[in-house]
Amino acid sequence: MAETSGPTAAGGSTSSTVTTESETQPEHRSLTLKLRKRKPDKKVEWTCDTVDNENLGRRSSKCCCIYEKPRPFGESSSESEDDDDCCESAHCIRGHKKATSGSKETPSSHHDKTGSMQH
């Protein structure tokens, strides 16, 4: 700190100047950004070979209508003996048939040798 004073020529008054020096430390601020991957919109998209099995202009991922056989109260769905991947009805436009043991497969068949579906 410095102070100066001195007489003036006309009025006899004095003036003073005060100088203050202070050390200012720069502020160190840090900013952290957390980037997150944008979640994709959840939507169903059908390919051109998806079947419209009800002829209503809608598409479905299954080739046949889903029918659940009525079962007695208390019987779980895992106890059912008819756990087929497709139906045998005439309206199945992909021609799926129930695989029988010992039957020969044709090259155009959708089944592999274990009898499971391939799509």
UniProtKB/Swiss-Prot annotation:
Pfam families: PPI_Ypi1
GO biological process: defense response to Gram-positive bacterium; negative regulation of cytokine production; protein ubiquitination; ubiquitin-dependent protein catabolic process
Biased composition (Low complexity): 1-23
Region ranges (Atypical RING finger domain 2): 87-96
Catalytic activity: S-ubiquitinyl-[E2 ubiquitin-conjugating enzyme]-L-cysteine + [acceptor protein]-L-lysine = [E2 ubiquitin-conjugating enzyme]-L-cysteine + N(6)-ubiquitinyl-[acceptor protein]-L-lysine
Keyword terms of this UniProt record: Protein phosphatase inhibitor, Transferase, Ubl conjugation pathway
GO cellular component: nucleus
Record-level Gene Ontology MF annotations: protein phosphatase 1 binding; protein serine/threonine phosphatase inhibitor activity; ubiquitin protein ligase activity
Region (Disordered): 1-42, 96-119
Protein name from the UniProt record: E3 ubiquitin-protein ligase PPP1R11
Organism: Xenopus laevis
